A protein has these predicted regions:
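Active-site and donor-binding regions of nucleotide-sugar-utilizing enzymes
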Residues: 43-171
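Membrane-proximal basic amphipathic "stem/tether" segments
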Residues: 1-43
Length: 171
């Protein structure tokens, strides 16, 4: 049993951490998504990046701010670490691995998701997920470790045309 394996290998504390950070978070998002499933999508962009405010997600965020897209879109950053950085108008931040009803609301209503590292599951089929790869992968079979699928990602940006066939094979 997978649950018993987690307890044996990582202990009860890690089990409760997984339940809190992942399972409760997903449950809240599913519940909020059910409530708003008939509501239209809003001009919300959800960004996740490898480290907070960096990689391709950071470059995309900088582009959005420099070109005033935060005037039309609410930009929601999903952070891995608590951060006291001051954000410009119409930009909000939430911890990726902490339950939040407001974060779940934004996830359930967002038009666009971007990710560099951890793919945040779309709540609805009419949302679009863009994956910005942040580097090259090893030239070996990564399929067992590649936690992405064509169901989760609508558009995949690779670092080079030379990697396109490799990525397509891995998904």
């Amino acid at each position: 049993n997978k649950l018993i394996g987690v307890i044996r290998e990582q202990g009860w504390k890690r089990l409760f951490q997984i339940i809190y950070e992942v399972k409760i978070n997903n449950l809240i998002t599913k519940f909020v998504s059910i409530i708003f499933r008939r509501s239209g999508l809003k001009n919300i962009i959800v960004i996740e990046s490898h480290n907070d405010f960096d990689c391709n997600g950071g470059a995309f965020y900088n582009y959005l701010i420099e070109h005033g897209y935060n005037q039309k879109y609410l930009i929601v950053w999903l952070l891995k670490k608590k951060n006291d950085i001051k954000l410009p108008y119409n930009v909000k931040k939430f911890l990726l691995h902490r339950p939040s009803i407001l974060k779940s609301y934004y996830i359930s209503r967002a038009k666009i998701f971007t990710s560099d590292n951890e793919v945040v599951p779309k709540a609805r089929d009419d949302q679009k997920m863009y994956y910005f790869d942040h580097g090259s992968i090893c030239l070996k079979n990564c399929k067992p470790f590649f936690n992405m699928s064509r169901k989760k990602i609508d558009y995949f940006f690779s670092p080079s045309p030379n990697y396109d066939a490799i990525y397509c094979n891995q998904m």
